[in-house]
């Protein structure tokens, strides 16, 4: 989806003013970048929204990286013994204008991956990160055994941030991108 598609069919929870703010890439590349937290149930349009925003950022020549959190965690666990590779990945992720973590704490991740995720968020301080999740920050801590790490990670995500809660009454994928029936 593109920004034009999103503007033509915005989720009802996003009024014109916040939508205009999201279209303006200043929240990503301005002097005070913000994190974006998009919360909603399956089918609520979270991915539709974040893909349109990512496409808009790319069209403005900003660098964007998308990770499903479980895939990032698997990669981090795979290179766990290679400290240099882990540090290189953290450094690489920290350089993007916008990093998107989708399916955020939909499933548990290893304590190692959680610690490195904290390092990534620390390295991204002052840069925009988008979190896409079915649950809010109050639930993420349930997936993180170390409560100090949980509080610190959540604090780095939420401050400073914008939050959009989608209620899921409409499945935007079905509504605006119908597939042919065979």
Model-derived features: positions:
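N-terminal pre-Walker A segment at the start of P-loop NTPase domains
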Residues: 3-26
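Residue-level preference for the first positions of well-ordered beta-strands
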Residues: 35-37, 64, 98, 130
């Amino acid at each position: 989806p593109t920004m034009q598609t999103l503007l033509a069919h915005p989720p009802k929870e996003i009024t014109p003013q916040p939508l205009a703010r999201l279209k303006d890439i200043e929240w990503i590349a301005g002097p005070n970048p913000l994190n974006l937290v998009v919360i909603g149930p399956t089918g609520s349009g979270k991915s539709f929204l974040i893909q349109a925003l990512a496409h808009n950022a790319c069209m403005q020549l900003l660098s964007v990286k998308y990770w499903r959190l479980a895939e990032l965690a698997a990669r981090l666990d795979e290179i766990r013994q290679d400290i240099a590779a882990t540090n290189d990945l953290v450094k690489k992720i920290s350089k993007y204008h916008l990093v998107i973590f989708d399916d955020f704490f939909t499933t548990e991740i290893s304590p190692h991956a959680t610690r490195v995720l904290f390092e990534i968020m620390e390295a991204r301080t002052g840069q925009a990160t988008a979190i896409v999740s079915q649950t809010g920050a109050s639930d993420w801590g349930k997936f993180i055994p170390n409560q100090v790490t949980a509080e610190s990670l959540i604090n780095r995500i939420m401050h400073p941030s914008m939050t959009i809660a989608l209620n899921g009454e409409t499945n935007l994928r079905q509504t605006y991108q119908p597939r042919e029936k065979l």
